C-alpha cells in the first residue's frame, strides 16, 4: 500500500440525516452505530476477533482529514492503519489519524498499541467525547490493494479529549457484510 495515501477528488462525508432515506436499515445500523465497533465485531465473530496492523507512522495527512481536525492542509500526523478481523478475515479497514502537534502534547501514546484495538482504548476512557458519525463511499485509491473495491461504505468520527483530536475512519469490507448476513439467518 502506498504510505503517502493519495488525495482523491472531494469526498462527501454525510451525516445520518442525509442517508436515512437512501440506504437499507442494516447498512445504516452498521454505519451509524455509536457503540464500540470492536465490541460489535467481537460479538459477531464469537470472540474470534483480532487486529492486524498494516502501517503506523508519521506522514502528511489527507486534505479531508486535515479539514476534519482543523489542521492546515498537508500537516503531518500520526497514521495507524489496521485490519479488524473476524475469523482471520479482514472485515474492516480502519485508519486513525491525529495531528503531530496535538498528539505530542496530548498524552496519548499511539505508537504502543500494536495489535490492540484503538476503539477499545477510546471507549474505555470516559474523557473522550465522540463527535457525530459521517459516512461516504470510500475512495478505492485509499484502500490497501488487497481489499480495494469500488463503492465500499466507510464511516468516520472525531474523538476529542482535552484538546487532543483523533479521527477514526472504518471501511466495511465485503466479508463483514457476508458474516452479518449469515448471523441474521
From Swiss-Prot:
UniProt main location, coarse: cytoplasm
This protein's UniProt keywords: Cytoplasm, Lyase, Pyruvate, Ubiquinone biosynthesis
Name of the top EC class for this enzyme: lyase
Catalysis performed (reactions): chorismate = 4-hydroxybenzoate + pyruvate
Claim: Protein biosynthesis is one of the keywords in the record: no
Residues that, per the record, bind substrate: 80, 118, 170
Subcellular location: Cytoplasm
Source species, domain of life: Bacteria
Any Pfam family hit: Chor_lyase
Entry EC no(s): 4.1.3.40
Protein's UniProt keywords contain Lyase: yes
Purpose of the protein: Removes the pyruvyl group from chorismate, with concomitant aromatization of the ring, to provide 4-hydroxybenzoate (4HB) for the ubiquinone pathway.
HAMAP family recorded: UbiC
Similarity comment text for this entry: Belongs to the UbiC family.
Protein's recorded name: Probable chorismate pyruvate-lyase 2
Gene symbol of the encoding locus: ubiC2
Amino acid at each position: 500500500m502506498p504510505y503517502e495515501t493519495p488525495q482523491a477528488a472531494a469526498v462527501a462525508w454525510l451525516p445520518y440525516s442525509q442517508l436515512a432515506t437512501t440506504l437499507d436499515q442494516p447498512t445504516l445500523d452498521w454505519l451509524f452505530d455509536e457503540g464500540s465497533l470492536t465490541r460489535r465485531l467481537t460479538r459477531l465473530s464469537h470472540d474470534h476477533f483480532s487486529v492486524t496492523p498494516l502501517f503506523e507512522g508519521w506522514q502528511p495527512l489527507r486534505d479531508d482529514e486535515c479539514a476534519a481536525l482543523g489542521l492546515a492542509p498537508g500537516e503531518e500526523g500520526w497514521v495507524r492503519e489496521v485490519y479488524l478481523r473476524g475469523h482471520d478475515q479482514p472485515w474492516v479497514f480502519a485508519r486513525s489519524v491525529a495531528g503531530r502537534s496535538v498528539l505530542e502534547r496530548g498524552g496519548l501514546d499511539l505508537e504502543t498499541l500494536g495489535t490492540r484495538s484503538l476503539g477499545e482504548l477510546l471507549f474505555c476512557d470516559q474523557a473522550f467525547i465522540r463527535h457525530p458519525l459521517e459516512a461516504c463511499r470510500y475512495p478505492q485509491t485509499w484502500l490497501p490493494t488487497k481489499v480495494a473495491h469500488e463503492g465500499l461504505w466507510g464511516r468516520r468520527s472525531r474523538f476529542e479529549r482535552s484538546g487532543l483530536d483523533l479521527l477514526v475512519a472504518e471501511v466495511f469490507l465485503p466479508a463483514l457484510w457476508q458474516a452479518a448476513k449469515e448471523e441474521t439467518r
